[in-house]
Curated annotation (Swiss-Prot):
Residue spans of biased composition, Polar residues class: 197-207
Originating gene: kdpC
Presence of keyword Methyltransferase: no
Annotated Gene Ontology cellular component terms: plasma membrane
Induction section of the entry: Up-regulated in response to K(+) limitation. Induced under desiccating conditions.
Name of the protein this chain belongs to: Potassium-transporting ATPase KdpC subunit
Length: 216
């Protein structure tokens, strides 16, 4: 094989790397940034004008029963990797796998420690998604948790149901997919409502203190 025989495949390799490795990928990134800037950046969620996002609309976070700090929030689906976006994988345990039965029983026990409308736990609350970091639950799974969240936060059930309606996404084009509730979006609404309650309580305490001191 002479140099001329090698030149053709090497030139083809170089052109392919340039076109498909740089130009094609670069053009897709440029188009994505121009047309879908939020989606191309990972659909980050910002609150209160912070520079750092609190999460992503497309990647779930660990809101789970068994974590005391999450009792006042809506729980997300189980995750095999603690919602680590660097390792997208589920356990793929089959229905006869004893490890799956053990994990589901533990989830059901944690859920049953708090107020529930009935014993029919929605499957979303005890089953992983295929990626193991699904950011959504079904409306039924969210509504099942309203009683607990209302009792833990003091937010009325009516207002919580309104939050669920606001956080519910419809099927794409009304056809593909199912109705789904973004857990992070819903919990940010709960957090805002709790902050409003705290501000109201603080103002009430200040007014009561002023009255007691004879300022009014």
């Amino acid at each position: 094989m002479n140099r001329q025989d090698l030149a053709v495949p090497l030139r083809l390799l170089g052109v392919s790397l340039l076109v498909f490795g740089l130009l094609y990928q670069g053009s897709l990134m440029a188009i994505g940034d121009a047309v879908f800037p939020n989606s191309s950046a990972g659909s980050p969620v910002y609150v209160d004008g912070q520079e750092q996002p609190v999460g992503s609309q497309m990647i779930g976070q660990q809101f789970r029963p068994g974590q005391p700090e999450d009792v006042q929030y809506f729980w997300s689906r189980p995750s095999a990797n603690d919602y680590n976006a660097m390792t997208s994988a589920s356990t793929n345990w089959g229905p006869t796998n004893p490890l799956l039965s053990e994990r589901v029983r533990a989830d059901l026990q944690n859920i049953s420690q708090y107020e529930t409308p009935d014993d029919s736990v929605p499957v979303n609350l005890v089953s992983e998604s295929g990626s193991s970091y699904d950011a959504h639950i079904s409306p039924a799974a969210a509504e099942y948790q309203v009683l607990r969240v209302a009792n833990q936060t003091g937010i009325s059930e009516q207002r919580l149901n309104e939050m669920i309606d606001e956080a519910t996404k419809e099927p794409w084009l009304g056809i593909w997919g199912h109705e789904r509730v973004n857990v992070l979006e819903l919990n940010l609404m709960v957090r805002d409502a709790l902050n409003e309650q705290n501000e109201t309580d603080q103002n009430s305490d200040m007014n009561a203190s002023e009255i007691a001191n004879g300022d009014h």
